[in-house]
Amino acid sequence: MYILTNILSIISNDVPTPYALGFQDSATPNQEGILELHDNIMFYLLVILGLVSWMLYTITKTYSKNPLPYKYMKHGQFIEIIWTIFPAVVLLIIAFPSFILLYLCDEVISPAMTVKVIGYQWYWKYEYSDFVNSNGETVEFESYIIPDDLLEEGQLRLLDTDTSVVVPVDTHIRFIVTAADVIHDFAIPSLGIKVDANPGRLNQVSALIQREGVFYGMCSELCGTGHSQMPIKIEVVSLGKYLGWLNEQ
């Protein structure tokens, strides 16, 4: 029974995998919308590829057998209308869902908590500005990559950190992102989050994480020699576990 349960359980892919050609599994409505938009656009592109391939094949196959001397025809108004209107319609079909999703991803909906993210060369600092510890100080900590020689069994190379961001599941979370030195980028693929961290500027993005788990990301803006050593690790837990973790800070 235990083996059957493991087989039937859903195992989500929340980390990069070698030679992967697809996306990581979504954990937020924003990422679900991104995946759906990608699938729709891919469908349109495959239809266009098939149509153009069929036209080229038909033209090359029947051109020599065509009895009509089209070399003296200067223009064809009907076909010119078709190849102007058809691409315009396809672009509109792709553009409208893209614009809607773009604005939805930028919208911050009544956040229940805020996490401030500050990028440094080459680590992240996190501040829970809504909470204070027993000393009356804001809950904050720095997050560094775990070196290869200190990795334990089960930890991921270039992805695991010494401390991780802990947030509750099914909660509207706002990330306020900035940087202290150069431009960084706070990106977690499974959450559909990718926002620039610019010195002197505050950018914000919201997330409603719908399942528990550990989600990994990386700095996605070239920021110097240690750019590849800025992983992001977010642990999503139940509200009870989150409050217990918060009391320990």
Curated annotation (Swiss-Prot):
Its main location: mitochondrion. The keyword Magnesium applies. This is Cytochrome c oxidase subunit 2. SUPFAM superfamilies: Cupredoxins, Cytochrome c oxidase subunit II-like, transmembrane region. The chain crosses the membrane at residues 40-60, 81-101. Cu cation A1 binds at residues 184, 219, 223, 230. GO terms for molecular function: copper ion binding; cytochrome-c oxidase activity. The gene is COX2. The lineage of its organism: Eukaryota, Fungi, Dikarya, Ascomycota, Saccharomycotina. Belongs to the cytochrome c oxidase subunit 2 family.
